[in-house]
Each structure stands twice: as C-alpha cells, then as structure tokens.
C-alpha cells in the first residue's frame, strides 16, 4: 500500500518537477538577473522624473490634492521598506527643485520617465521572446496611458480605502474593514502585476496564466518587503559601512530585488503556457505512434 501511495505521489509531482526545470531553464536562458540589474539602473535614473510627472498630474486635478499626500505615504511605506521616510524626504526635495525647471527641462523629465516604460516593455518582450513590434505611436500611447492612468487609479483606490476607514464607526463592519485594509497592498500589487503581464507583452497572454504569475509575484513582493525590512534592521551592515550614504545602496538593492520578483512573475506566467504546449505536443506524439 505504501508503495502504491509513493508511486501516486511520484506520478503527481513529476509534472511539477518538469515545470520547475523548464522555469529554471528559461530564467537561465533569458538572463533574468541581468535584465533585473538593467531595469534597476534605469529605474534609479528615472525615479525622480517619474515622481515629478506623477505629482504634476495630481496637481492638475484638485480633487486628488488630499489623496496625493496619502499616496506618497502609502507608496514609500509599502513599496520602500525600512528606509522609506529618508528616501521620501530626498525625493520630495529633488522634485521641488525640478519644479523650477523650464519647459524644455520638463519635457526632458517626461522623456526620461517614458524611457523607463520602454525598458520595461523591452525586458518583458525579451522574456516572452516576442519578435512582434508595436507601431511607435501605439507604444507611446500605451506608455503615456500607464504613466497617467496608473497614478490616478492608485489615487482612486486610496480614496476608496479612506472611505472604508470612515465607515469604521459601524462596529459590525469594523473587523471586515480591518481585514480588507490589511490585504489591500497585496490586492493592489496583484492587480498591478496582472495588468503588467497582460498589457505589455506584444503576444497574447492567457488570462489565467497572468493571474497566477501576478499572484505569485505579489506574494513574493509582500514577503520580500517584510524580509528586507527585517534584514536592514537586524543586520545594519550598510549603515556601519556607508554611514549617512547607506540609503543609496539600500535603495539600489531593494529596487533590484523588486525587479527580480517582477521578472520572476513574468517567467512563471510564460512558462505556464509553454509547458502546456509542450505537454500537449508530447501527448499528441504518443497518440500518433502505432
């Protein structure tokens, strides 16, 4: 009986092992960690221009004036663990300086922010191994839509969460609202990753694959935040070595780790579809044999 159980368990785990092997092979062939390093470098160059463009968008919509403050605190608290307060002060100072720029300088900020979108597009289509190229006008429209609608949607979601907080006077809703707000960063990350994996690749991405890959990436991102914050507070080696400049390597390591998670989610998404195709081809080959 134990032998039969072992055989059944081995039979069920064999496909999973084959899928993990295929995933590891794709990660190695796509040089995922190198792509993450490139994106981290571009992200650091584009960080201040991107934030400047986003804050300018909020300034253009007075209805989001209060939400923009909440969004800043939410982003730095949930997406930049351990050193979010320090980084927020520096970035807000840089953005304040950028507001004094001329129209030509402002256009340069927008172009730099769009270059980050182009780098993300190139990296994800490299992972999907897509040779299909979008028209330049269409690509620009997609990048601009992400750059403009993304922050506005995030602001709207924070407005909803603020409304939920205002309902906490109802004792029967108190526990439910607390639970919703507790998992709100996870849901927001899941939605963002799903949109990223669904919209950016030039090939058609099955919705269920994008959902699974986005969920894994969102969970790893939330765990990564907690693990990274624990590491920084428990082993303060960067502070001891770099002193007041410790925020620079800490920010770079966190951005690099974040892109590793994003690209891993993309690899998982594309591997699910590829494994399904390989399995179907193998079954078809076996059926054709006499």
Swiss-Prot record:
Coiled coil: none annotated. Keywords: Cell inner membrane, Cell membrane, Membrane, Transmembrane, Transmembrane helix. Pfam families: Virul_fac_BrkB. It is a multi-pass membrane protein. GO terms for cellular component: plasma membrane. It is found in: Cell inner membrane. The chain crosses the membrane at residues 44-64, 104-124, 140-160, 183-203, 210-230, 244-264. InterPro entries: UPF0761_bac (IPR023679), Virul_fac_BrkB (IPR017039). Belongs to the UPF0761 family. This is UPF0761 membrane protein Ent638_4092. It comes from Enterobacter sp. (strain 638).
């Amino acid at each position: 009986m134990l032998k039969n159980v072992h055989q059944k368990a081995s039979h069920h785990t064999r496909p999973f092992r084959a899928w993990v092997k295929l995933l590891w092979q794709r990660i190695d062939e796509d040089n995922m960690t190198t792509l993450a390093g490139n994106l981290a470098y571009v992200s650091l160059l584009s960080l201040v221009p991107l934030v400047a463009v986003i804050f300018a968008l909020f300034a253009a919509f007075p209805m989001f004036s209060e939400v923009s403050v909440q969004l800043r605190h939410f982003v730095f608290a949930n997406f930049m663990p351990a050193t979010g307060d320090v980084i927020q002060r520096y970035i807000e100072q840089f953005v304040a300086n950028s507001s004094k720029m001329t129209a030509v300088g402002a256009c340069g900020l927008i172009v730099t922010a769009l270059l980050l979108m182009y780098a993300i597009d190139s990296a994800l289509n490299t992972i999907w191994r897509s040779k299909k190229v979008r028209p330049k006008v269409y690509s620009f429209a997609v990048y601009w839509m992400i750059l403009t609608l993304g922050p506005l949607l995030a602001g709207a979601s924070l407005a909803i969460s603020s409304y939920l907080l205002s309902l906490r006077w109802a004792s029967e809703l108190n526990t439910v609202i607390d639970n919703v707000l507790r998992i709100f960063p996870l849901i927001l990350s899941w939605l963002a990753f799903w949109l990223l994996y669904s919209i950016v690749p030039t090939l058609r991405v099955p919705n269920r694959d994008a959902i699974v890959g986005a969920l894994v990436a969102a969970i790893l991102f939330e765990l990564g935040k907690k693990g990274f914050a624990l590491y920084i507070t428990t082993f303060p080696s960067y502070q001891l070595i770099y002193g007041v400049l410790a925020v620079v390597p800490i920010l770079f390591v966190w951005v690099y780790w974040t892109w590793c998670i994003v690209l891993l989610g993309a690899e998982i998404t594309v591997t699910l579809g590829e494994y399904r195709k390989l399995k179907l081809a193998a079954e078809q080959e076996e059926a054709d044999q006499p």
